[in-house]
Swiss-Prot record:
<feature type="disulfide bond">
    <location>
        <begin position="322"/>
        <end position="330"/>
    </location>
</feature>
<feature type="active site">
    <location>
        <position position="255"/>
    </location>
</feature>
<feature type="glycosylation site" description="N-linked (GlcNAc...) asparagine">
    <location>
        <position position="128"/>
    </location>
</feature>
<dbReference type="InterPro" id="IPR012334">
    <property type="entry name" value="Pectin_lyas_fold"/>
</dbReference>
<comment type="function">
    <text>Pectinolytic enzymes consist of four classes of enzymes: pectin lyase, polygalacturonase, pectin methylesterase and rhamnogalacturonase. Among pectinolytic enzymes, pectin lyase is the most important in depolymerization of pectin, since it cleaves internal glycosidic bonds of highly methylated pectins.</text>
</comment>
<keyword id="KW-0325">Glycoprotein</keyword>
<dbReference type="GO" id="GO:0071555">
    <property type="term" value="P:cell wall organization"/>
</dbReference>
<keyword id="KW-0456">Lyase</keyword>
<feature type="signal peptide">
    <location>
        <begin position="1"/>
        <end position="19"/>
    </location>
</feature>
<dbReference type="InterPro" id="IPR045032">
    <property type="entry name" value="PEL"/>
</dbReference>
<dbReference type="GO" id="GO:0030570">
    <property type="term" value="F:pectate lyase activity"/>
</dbReference>
<keyword id="KW-1015">Disulfide bond</keyword>
<dbReference type="InterPro" id="IPR002022">
    <property type="entry name" value="Pec_lyase"/>
</dbReference>
<protein>
    <recommendedName>
        <fullName>Pectin lyase B</fullName>
        <ecNumber>4.2.2.10</ecNumber>
    </recommendedName>
</protein>
<dbReference type="InterPro" id="IPR011050">
    <property type="entry name" value="Pectin_lyase_fold/virulence"/>
</dbReference>
<keyword id="KW-0119">Carbohydrate metabolism</keyword>
<keyword id="KW-0732">Signal</keyword>
Length: 379
């Protein structure tokens, strides 16, 4: 039977529609998130259309097939900032956001800063959205995402967020959650970000899963003036449960993550590689269980004294307690050319009981799979 061109076109469109949308499902605390569900996929063609789709009240599956470059769309600002870490060419300088330079760095040299306005504040993402990239094509450049103000049931999958005023602290965050719930961030790549690659807080973000994502800290400008990004992952919400699984956290110099507020973090099967500083920073209110992770070339796995509570899954005997609260025996972490990471607080483990808990593999599985599977285009 010979198919005529109109019929072929219809079949192609149907195949495209059936293939579009979310791949797989969330593990861990955000298990059950559906995003835009079975809504007919939409394909924005302009930055304005993308902003509209993300910010309206409809359930949507939004498919990105190209780079959406926000650079220059909101103009630039030139003003006086400061240089707390010096004026060498590899050092970040700071925007005087909310008088930060004035109030917190009064002795830092003043410098002129010119930044792109679009990067400072991300795109608002409302409830019941799936934002999905096609192949390796879906990129948001020059602007991040904000899942805030009560937004819930959101999936961000297989996209890249890049180039948010990387020279400037306070130049923008890649992904912000604040007063949210049921959010799944999966196979996302972030690179060349001014401030945080991922930030939760200060209001509750409740149930969140971040999986299979690539936080790339390679930069021409950093607060440590060495090409390693300092502002990695900041988890300080007032009532948050965060699953961090299968992520590749690369070339950072600090705060990857910083955990505080009132945050229960399950860090499982992640791969930290190549840091010039520290990975974890745990303040009061941070409750961290770390298992099955790999730390390679991380000189300081944890910064200073733990202000909250930490269970590092130190050995098989100690790890048996996890079966009572997580339903499995915790997996030891693996280390190569890295600092020590050994603490076994157990009082907080009861907080995992009855929750949706991600499965855990041996660290050797993460070691072999995470670098090749994390990030955009690796579904």
């Amino acid at each position: 039977m010979r198919l005529h061109a109109p019929i072929l076109s219809l079949l192609a469109a149907a195949a495209s529609t059936s293939a579009a949308g979310v791949t797989g499902s969330a593990e861990g605390f955000a298990k059950g998130v559906t995003g835009g569900g079975s809504a007919t996929p939409v394909y924005p063609s302009t930055t304005a259309e993308l902003v509209s789709y993300l910010g309206d009240s409809s359930a949507r599956v939004i498919v990105l097939t190209k780079t959406f470059d926000f650079t220059g769309t909101e103009g630039t600002t030139t003003e006086t900032g400061c240089a707390p870490w010096g004026t060498a060419s590899a050092c970040q300088v700071a925007i005087n956001k909310n008088d930060w330079c004035t109030n917190y760095q009064p002795n830092a040299p003043s410098v002129s800063v010119t930044y792109d306005n679009a990067g400072v504040l991300g795109i608002t993402v409302k409830s019941n959205k799936s934002l999905v990239g096609e192949g390796s094509s879906g990129v948001i450049k020059g602007k991040g995402l904000r899942i805030v103000s009560g937004a819930s049931n959101v999936i961000i999958q297989n996209i890249a967020i890049t180039d948010l005023n990387p020279k400037y602290v306070w130049g923008g965050d890649a992904i912000t959650l604040d007063n949210a719930d049921m959010v799944w961030i999966d196979h996302v790549t972030t690179a060349r970000i001014g401030r945080q690659h991922l930030v939760l807080g200060t209001s509750a973000s409740n149930r969140v899963t971040v999986s299979n994502s690539y936080f790339n800290g390679v930069t021409s400008y950093s607060a440590t003036c060495d090409g390693y990004h300092y502002w990695g992952i900041y988890l300080t919400g007032s009532n948050d449960m965060v699953t961090l699984k299968g992520n590749y956290i690369y070339h950072m110099s600090g705060r990857s993550p910083k955990v505080g507020g009132n945050t229960l973090l399950h860090a499982v099967n992640n791969y930290w590689y190549d840091s010039s500083g520290h990975a974890f920073e745990i303040d009061s209110g941070g409750y961290v269980l770390a298992e099955g992770n790999v730390f390679q070339n991380i000189p300081t796995v944890i910064e200073g004294t733990v202000g909250g509570q930490l269970f590092t899954s130190p050995d098989s005997s100690t790890n048996a307690i996890c079966s009572t609260y997580l339903g499995h025996t915790c997996q030891v972490n693996g280390f190569g050319s890295s600092g020590t990471f050994k603490q076994a607080d157990t009082a907080f483990l009861v907080n995992f009981q009855g929750k949706n808990i991600a499965s855990a593999s041996a660290y050797t599985v993460a070691q072999s799979s995470v670098p090749s599977n994390a990030g955009q285009g690796k579904l």
